[in-house]
């Protein structure tokens, strides 16, 4: 069954098991890509992190694309504790903010899961570094609501007080997106200076681009 929902279509696939549905998706579907990527990917794992463990999201958490198994191993060897969270990224993550007042933007909901152990470790940690806006949204949603697993419509924008994340590793985002508004909430107006330097130095932007490590305490 295929029904239109705004600018996208909802397709319902029916199978006997989850494996049947995933097989149908693999056979007939294509990996959703941001609208600015016009070339099909020859290998699907080029748009996937090395630590992804199950199909669910409509987009990869692109800050994680910078990590290799060796880099993760080196980080662990240096004493950095690595914890995981789940956030099922929806297609609306690509949608621009079209409302004149950004606070009127209809924020999409996404499913997240943060274990109690992860939240406790974050509370004990000297500092918490989130890899990507998706991990940030999951951690902040769990800490704010007290719900470890559920759906979140959290819109992190100017004035939000972060409860968990101290540093954020993230790529450079498109203008007029909720992702960029989260960056402004994290570091304030100096994000403009950071982007100006990146543009002047010809950094690569967006999903397959460079990343920056932001410290909200500076």
Which stretches of residues belong to each language-model region?
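Surface-exposed, charge/polar-rich loops and edge strands
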Residues: 1-218
């Amino acid at each position: 069954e295929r029904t239109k929902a705004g600018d996208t279509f909802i397709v319902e696939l029916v199978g006997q098991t989850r494996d049947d549905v995933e097989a149908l998706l693999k056979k007939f579907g294509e990996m959703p890509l941001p609208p600015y990527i016009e070339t099909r990917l020859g290998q699907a794992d080029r748009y996937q992190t090395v630590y992804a463990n199950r199909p669910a999201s409509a987009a990869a958490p692109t800050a994680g694309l910078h990590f290799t198994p060796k880099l993760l191993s080196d980080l662990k060897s240096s004493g950095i504790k690595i914890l995981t969270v789940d956030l099922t990224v929806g297609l609306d993550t690509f949608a621009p903010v079209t409302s004149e007042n950004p606070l009127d933007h209809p924020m999409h909901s996404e499913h997240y899961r943060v274990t109690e152990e992860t939240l406790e470790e974050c509370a004990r940690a000297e500092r918490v570094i989130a890899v990507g806006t998706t991990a940030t949204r999951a951690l902040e949603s769990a800490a704010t609501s007290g719900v470890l697993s559920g759906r979140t419509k959290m819109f992190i924008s100017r004035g939000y007080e972060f409860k968990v994340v101290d540093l954020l590793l993230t790529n450079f985002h498109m203008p007029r997106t909720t992702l960029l508004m989260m960056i402004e909430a994290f570091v304030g107006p100096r994000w403009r200076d950071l982007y100006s330097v990146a543009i002047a130095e010809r950094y690569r932007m967006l999903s397959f681009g460079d990343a920056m490590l932001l410290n909200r305490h500076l």
